């Protein structure tokens, strides 16, 4: 058993649709999780990441969602081990005024700009839903995501499908 970090609850592991752990045989393991920061005990929605070449020693990265559009309300994180970069993707529970919709589901992602183990996750994180420019997001209220990596010719493509929690049939 390897202790990597702390989480107040296991939102990344609560659903069979998320992929909190991803492996690239040439790079290693990348993990995404809902992180608990002891010096900020009121919030449990920080997004963290961990990297390991061998699955035994992990380096952790904290607070990936502290800048807009992140609101430190991350849910359902997933990791995608791309050929060159590790990606961390999650749903941010946002207020309706920041584009997530009535129930606040806004898919967001970041990646380690310095490759695996580089420790420089892109900030601010970016919208995965390209319908968020301009706000509000269209479609809104995207919550639990299922992600995978495929290739178009030789270029990696991240595929994502989200459940939509909307109170309106029109949405």
Per-region residue spans from a language model:
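Extracellular, repeat-based ectodomains that mediate carbohydrate processing or recognition
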Residues: 1-171
């Amino acid at each position: 058993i390897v202790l990597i970090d702390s989480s107040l609850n296991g939102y990344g592991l609560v659903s069979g649709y998320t992929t909190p752990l991803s492996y690239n045989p040439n790079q290693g393991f990348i993990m995404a999780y809902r992180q608990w920061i002891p010096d900020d005990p009121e919030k449990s929605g920080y997004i963290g990441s961990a990297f390991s070449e061998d699955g035994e020693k992990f380096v952790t990265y904290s607070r990936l969602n502290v800048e807009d559009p992140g609101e430190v309300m991350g849910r359902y994180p997933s990791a995608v081990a791309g050929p060159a970069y590790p990606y961390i993707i999650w749903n941010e529970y946002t207020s309706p005024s920041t584009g997530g919709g009535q129930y606040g589901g806004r898919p967001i992602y970041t990646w380690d700009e310095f490759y695996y183990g580089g420790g420089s996750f892109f900030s601010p994180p970016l919208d995965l839903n390209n319908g968020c420019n301009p706000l509000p997001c269209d479609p809104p209220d995207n919550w639990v995501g299922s992600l995978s990596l495929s290739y178009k010719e030789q270029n990696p493509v991240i595929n994502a499908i989200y459940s939509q929690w909307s109170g309106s049939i029109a949405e």
